[in-house]
Amino acid sequence: MMERFEKIEMKIPAKAEYVAIIRLTMAGVANRTGFAYDDIEDMKIAISEACTNIVQHAYKEDVGEIAIVFGLYEDRLEIMVADNGVSFDFNNLRSKVGPYDISKPVEHLPENGLGLYLINTLMDDIQIMHDEGMTVLMTKYIQREQVENDGNPISTYNSY
């Protein structure tokens, strides 16, 4: 039996001025799903980076579309960001990025690839598929319990 979930789909022009719409939509969906503020902020950065990569790399001269699908599950939010443009080799780029080395001057930071490193760091799971374009599937699990200073768990659920 398939796991039940709700799906929200959107398409926007692959232009920088539309990325904020996706970020705000994702924040609303994540808030409704029960995510903590810090997790929502992390997901906002991750989805912004994924969309910005498409805007910068996928469509050279043409203006294409970004397709976004939110999968709302009981324990997680899956976010798929896809394009039909030119792919780049994520695994090759991923191998070139990593944690910031404090001993290196700021001038030596890589210009490209830091966004993918951020996505990988901020999300619980990330999968990349190269077909006709590129699809990024990001997953964030809901942390239902948090611990107060005295060590007692508190629920993030509203108690209405």
From Swiss-Prot:
Its EC number is 2.7.11.1. It holds the Pfam family HATPase_c_2. GO terms for molecular function: ATP binding; protein serine kinase activity; protein serine/threonine kinase activity; sigma factor antagonist activity. It catalyses: L-seryl-[protein] + ATP = O-phospho-L-seryl-[protein] + ADP + H(+); L-threonyl-[protein] + ATP = O-phospho-L-threonyl-[protein] + ADP + H(+). InterPro entries: Anti-sigma-factor_SerPK (IPR050267), HATPase_C_sf (IPR036890), RsbW (IPR010193). Transmembrane segments: none annotated. It is an enzyme of class 2 (transferase). It comes from the Bacteria. Negative regulator of sigma-B activity. Phosphorylates and inactivates its specific antagonist protein, RsbV. Upon phosphorylation of RsbV, RsbW is released and binds to sigma-B, thereby blocking its ability to form an RNA polymerase holoenzyme (E-sigma-B). Belongs to the anti-sigma-factor family. This is Serine-protein kinase RsbW. It comes from Bacillus cereus (strain AH187).
